[in-house]
Amino acid sequence: MPRWFTALFWSSIAAGALVVGLSSWDALIASPPDADPVRPRAVTITRDQWGVPHIHGRTDADVAYGIAIAHAEDDFRNLEEVLAAVRGRAGAILGEDGAKLDFAGHLLDAQAVADRGYASLSPATRALVEAYAQGLNDYASRHGHEQRLQGLFPVTGRDIVAGFVLRSPFFFGMDRVLGPLAEGKLPPRDAGPADERGSNAFAVSASRSDDATTRLIINSHQPWEGGVTWWELVVHSDEGWDFAGANFPGAPFPLLGHNKHLGWANTVNRMDLIDVYKLELNADRSQYRLDRQWLPLEARRVWLRVKYGPFVLPVPRTVYCSRHGAVILNEKGGFAIRHAGIGEVGQVEQYYRLNKARDFNEWRQIMAMQKVPATNFVYADAQGHIGMFYNALFPARAAGFDWKGVLPGNTSKTLWTSYLPWSADPMVVDPRAGWVANANNTPTVATAPDENLKAADFAPEMGVETFTTNRMHRFAELFAGVNGPISRETLLRIKFDKAYSKASPAGRWMAAVLTVDTAREPELAKAQALLRQWDWTADGVGPADSLAVAVLASVGREVYRGDALPPAAPKLRAAVDWLQGTFGRLDVPLGEFQRLRHGKADLPVFGGPDTLRAIYADRAADGRRVGNNGDGFIMLVEWPAGGAVRSQSVHQFGAATTRRASPHYADQAPLFATERWKPVPF
């Protein structure tokens, strides 16, 4: 359990435990708001042979209602947890892990931000989120036995908007800022997302393909289970909303995929969008200085609900706020946090409009709204346009300050209040090379070398990342190796590539492992000898694959974040002990070591950390490496010359990943493990 959460408030537990009726306290004081007006809905939900819902409604709002119903049928558990976090009650279900989210929600004041900005959304968007909330309420009222948290429903359109407000900053590293500050430490200079598991996205134009077809590969890496796992859907409305793709629990529309005209994929980017300020406080820490004024430090009492055994314990905390944003007080002082998109509710508006964009110009106009503060977009369309957009809401920062460090909070010179225009974002559009790609890397590597952007073109105050993953190294190497047109088969071979580039950080780590002094360690010397035979692929063919994957996975997070690498000898020893202890040998076939497991499915799966066929995993009780992230929902979208869009997809498990009794709990796992596709009826 993260220390920052424990340090934050477990000292309050003793007092909280004295409260009577702890087992029912949370439900008794829960006071959900009144529901939005209930309206009749005209919607049908049909499911294809794989259980994927195809939702048709008279209006867009009717479709959103159907999305809620269908998603709840497949995964009410995660929907309930997401909604509980929005209401500040996740801790009542999930204990400490949930209470971390609750504290963050209070600190960022997500619900109040949604309330203040709700009227700024268009009537159509408000109708959409309210219809989605109505669908969740109707499902919950008919399936009360599934509810673990009493008093959560009804939810409202404002709750749906608040969910976007809460989750958005965590996609660009808010957890890596909050954690250290709550522990009394300073955040790392390069915050960014904590997770090394990334995403891939790439597109090939009709001019470069061998059959005049524009192709897009959607390959976002998300956890295979939980509140940000992909769920596939297809939607159609009589108002012209036609889209196939996937979303997260709590989203009233697909977040990526394609319509008839265009599509996009997303990957996480790691630019610097969060600033931390050291406040100048008065003696009792009730005021802070800004320029020549002493201003009151706003304070608000909140109660966290923390499940502990059969009880839900009330834990009081105080959250603080300055003009900069949320404030954390610790033994080092007061630290304010300001992030891109602070106070913004328009993410839902922009995603909804993107779903219905009809051409490249309209899509770009919608992107220029800048309501989605971060995430790369890789784009393709029926007209043959492709592009890589390093989408970010860059603060308009003053020169002369160390924006990666802790900033002085006593001067308005560091308190930015506006953003650079979207046109300032790094982007590569319709390159002559006919391909674009992103794999959580610097935007200066996105296509052929002679058409890539130059780092010098972007001011240091923007905080654009400079790191290149193994996956992007492989994209560049594989595309460079194609002379002439790119066929569909070549594109899929690139997608499922399982190799490591010696020029990548993973390659440099393996080089360090191979130079460990093993003169007095015969077991490690044997392991090194095996690794020297490795062919640098995790395809399950050679005898060294399992050892290589174990060694590379041991530093996956450090490699992804660009952190200093640890000494190699202990990591090599740990990998050797793992394989010897589990199998009694080092040359274990990768298919025996690395598995996909879900219900009765227990299958070999190939690839590794930071390969284009990405498999991230945890060590299971039986010593196997069991996948939990990486390649998951994957979609291939094609616009043939003069023809209608067509697509194929696959999910690591199936349409109903939390319904063990469903035939679609794990029916796609065999397809996924063997790198096969299913059609998407559209």
Language model segments and positions:
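C-terminal/peripheral segments of proteins
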Residues: P2-A511, R520, K526, R532-F682
